[in-house]
Design a protein with these regions (language model features):
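Alpha-helix-centered segments that form part of catalytic cores
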Residues: 116-126
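Histidine/acidic residue-rich metal-binding segments in metalloenzymes
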Residues: 2-118, 133-144
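Mid-to-C-terminal alpha-helical segments outside catalytic/metal-binding sites
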Residues: 68-69, 77, 88, 124, ...
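Short His-Asn-centered micro-motif
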Residues: 82-83, 125-128
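A short, flexible beta-alpha/helix-coil linker loop
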Residues: 1-2, 162
């Protein structure tokens, strides 16, 4: 974006402000954006662009944030990969970890954690409730590092049935971790949940 990729120092002031203010950073694909990197590849064919942009742009962003050292230099930055499903995440993490021993010392000596450790500390990847791969993905990246996206008001959205679909498709324990994971992505803690419970009880 703005001719600067996500690991560029250009974005450091914005990352720092997000950390300081405790504000979540979210990635969303850019299939309709005039600056989309998919347009030079697929032109005006929206089918091509819609399929490719959701996973490819998310993967490009995660590679930049992990390998490019954004999470190393901004350790308190919380990042959500949103409205693009998430079954791509385990495979990409495995690929980064495969290359990590060969390239870290020569190309990314600033990294002090493994790729999976950065993901576990800084990342959440969203589901939309009806994907067949949710439970398998949760087993690979952790249900607590997942969240849900309603994808409203897009034409392929499951809104308003996202949470309902999630509860139908995975065991309740996994669904609970995913729902709480989303709350943690946006900085809510157990103390916030207790305050909400107390407020709701007071209204009753």
């Amino acid at each position: 974006m703005n001719d600067h990729y996500w690991h560029s120092n250009y974005w450091d002031p914005l990352y720092a402000v997000h950390e300081e203010l405790n504000v979540t950073w979210g990635f969303h694909e850019g299939v309709s954006a005039v600056y989309s990197r998919m347009i030079p590849l697929y032109g005006e064919n929206r089918f091509y662009r819609h399929v490719a942009s959701h996973w490819i742009e998310m993967q490009q962003a995660m590679v930049a944030m992990i390998i490019g050292g954004v999470f190393e230099f901004h350790p308190r930055l919380r990042v959500g990969f949103l409205e693009a499903q998430n079954s791509w995440a385990p495979g990409l993490l495995s690929r980064i970890e495969w290359d990590y021993p060969q390239y870290r010392a020569s190309h990314a000596p600033y990294l002090t954690l493994t790729p999976r450790e950065y993901f576990r500390r800084n990342c959440w990847a969203a589901v939309e409730g009806s994907e067949a791969e949710i439970e398998a993905t949760a087993g690979l990246i952790g249900a607590d590092r997942m969240c849900i996206s309603t994808d409203y008001p897009h034409f392929d959205s499951n809104f308003p049935h996202v949470s309902e679909n999630l509860l139908k498709n995975v065991p309740r324990e996994i669904a609970a971790h995913i729902l709480v994971g989303g709350a943690h992505l946006y900085g809510f803690t157990e103390a916030d949940f207790k305050k909400a419970d107390a407020a709701a009880a007071g209204r009753g």
